[in-house]
Amino acid sequence: MKRRILPTGTVICGTAAVEQIGYEFSVRGIRRITAVSDSKLLNKSRSLLSDMEPDPGTDIRIISSDEEPPEDTEGLILMGSAPLPETKRRCPVLRIPLVPDDLSSRLPGTDILVLDRRFFRREGLLDQFLRELYRESLSEESSYPFPLQFPGIFQFSADTELIWGDETLGELGELLSRDKVRAPMLVTDRGIVAAGLLKGLLDSLDPGLDIIVRDNVPPDSDLQLIGSLTEDYRAYRRDGIIAMGGGSVLDTAKGMIINLELGGKNILALEGSNLLSPSPVPVYMIPTTSGTGSEATRVAVIADHNEKRKRLFVSQFLQPRAAILDSSLTISLPPYLTSITGMDAMSHAVEAFTCLGKNPLSDLMAWRALELLSAHLEQAVTFPAQAVHRRGMALASNLAGRAFSNSMVGMVHTIGHAIGGVCGAPHGSCMAVLLPFALEYNGDSITEALGKLLVPLKGIDSYEHTAASARGPAVIRHIRELNRSLHTATGGRHPCSLKEIAVKPSDFKAIAEAALGDASLMYNPRELSYGDIIEILKEAY
């Protein structure tokens, strides 16, 4: 079984979404923009584009669809159903549908789709269009039974080509050949080497490739290591990065992209959100766990061991060129690692669905991820060699990654990042322990959204036969029962409390202080104080 899922690019949807266009071109360094419109819509197009707020020095030209774009065009805007013109070079393409008929299909070659809700007021129109647009990404038609809820404006980015299934590792060679990559650096860890997974990858590639391997990535990606890997990348004149491993390896590759963007200066200069420009370095990611979803996200979490904290970087340009999900790579993953990485994916999906940054597309992705986790997590722990469960877990992790990458997360990650930084506890273990306690704390602020999650976790019948006020508590109870079940299935290694992951009460103060500086805190649906964090740590202990 093998599927190729093409990137859907960026969708910007909301009232007056056109006003965001200037930023999208600016962040890509594009100054010469050509807008193409049907001749009958030229006046409307001019009026609409006047709402843009381009950077000084940006030149926007509007032409009819029967004209050729100027040779110096760096970016294209296609108005309505205007066809994609030929240009001297490949340009980013932004499309603005103007009438409902323009939504009949999304033409190939569109990088950014702008859905201005002023043009699509008919109830359910955008709901239906978005479900169909992302049908392939979800691996099937959306089973989400509720109307999509649209905030004032939102953006969803999915720029990574995905190859998913069984025995898909051999597809990497085709990707490298297509992108003319001949001298990549392969980043991994020694566990991957010891398991024989690296040999399998290298054996599948063209022996004529000039590959250098760096297998010294630690369990937490590290600022200093990223610096030395970047120096090697330049010194050996590499032309691409392959990352094979768990979340630490994948985030290390993203850290290299940030460092290359800065020319080797302090990576912390770009800590935060949306400070990166597009990178010319092609990156290919091959996850060997099913939890972080880092191969699909706009996020990199990198350890700063000097400060004992995790640093967060967010940019759509951190998404890799392509990702390969091969079920055979996770079959050797021990039950304990399967369980905690699976709960990491669950925390991503649940927080994406309940945090302040949620949007209709992150809801669809999170929902499908939870359906897959319900079907496959316990089974993958109990029957690790069955490809159907490994395959389901790989896609669940990827979908949950795409969801939270575009909605962000909340206090589970706020506190979990702090515990990881202060105590060195595994991230997935932190997520497993904290998730039910965080949902209890946020409960009154997320009553409706939390209650809906009873459907993917326990089925529509359970949802319909449970009183509205009891649905949220039923979800929390189910997650606790799942943790206990995984605890038993892993011979007691899957944690249900903080004391099981070497957290001590004497660490609580440092954890709470670090948590208050975590960027995910702002997306939590309920305010969280130092005292609140201390109480939650006590409860989870």
Could you tell me what each predicted segment is?
Residues P436-Y541:
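Mobile late-domain/C-terminal helix-loop "cap" segments
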Residues P70-P100, Y233-N274, P280-T288, I415:
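A short, small-residue-rich loop immediately preceding and capping a beta-strand
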Residues Y336-L399, A403:
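C-terminal and late-domain segments of enzyme folds
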Residues P97-S139, P151-G152, L262-K358, A449-K452, ...:
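A glycine/threonine-rich phosphate-anchoring loop and its flanking beta-alpha core
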Residues G291, L399-M431, D518-M522:
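Glycine-rich phosphate/pyrophosphate-binding beta-alpha loops
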